[in-house]
Amino acid sequence: MALPTELRQALRELAAHTEGIDLPVYQAFERDPLEPIIGLGDTDAPLCFFGRDPGREEVRHGEPFIGSGGQIVRRVLYRHLHGAEMPDFEAGRALGRHYFWINTVPYKPIGNKAWSMAVKRRFQPLMRQLLIDSWHGRHIITLGREAFLWFAIGQPREARQRLEAFWQREDRFTANLDIDLQDAQGHARTFTLHPLPHPSPLNQTWFKRFPALLEARLRQLDASR
């Protein structure tokens, strides 16, 4: 599905007044630095992947979750769906339409450092609206602490504390948590978060375990349907 016109324009206007977008990378690939990188997939996709922010390869292709971390996710998904190894880049890319892909901020930051809380707060109402209005699913696999705790932004104190406490649990990568989101118009929905670590080689504690953790999540979700 296409990004709703009003939402796309609102994101572009917000990006135009946001410092820290990695302009040289966008220029190197002749990409518009105001164009949000969001992989909407099917509105009825049963599963959403929620990450931190796009990287260099995401800018190159204009799609989220297509770089090294995203390739790990896609390889596990392909193997789970087809029982075979992903044959090539395009096969992984084709998986995109079967899922909903979104980040805390849909623009690449300079140096691939996480966006500040101020920037995440600025974009949060629009990304929240996208989740509530443009996707009909419930289950969200969050990748990393930044993505998981995005769901605490703008929440009542009790909900924030519940999210923060959940992240401290030893079983956080096998358990799940329901969270309510409400947009500016008062439309509310309940989502179920299934957190996983960020699939980055820099995250040595969890990097090697990530494929097995994601496969376990996918099996859990298959069993719950």
Q: What is each residue range found by the language model?
A:
Residues A2-F173, I179-S224:
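A polyanion-binding, active-site-adjacent surface
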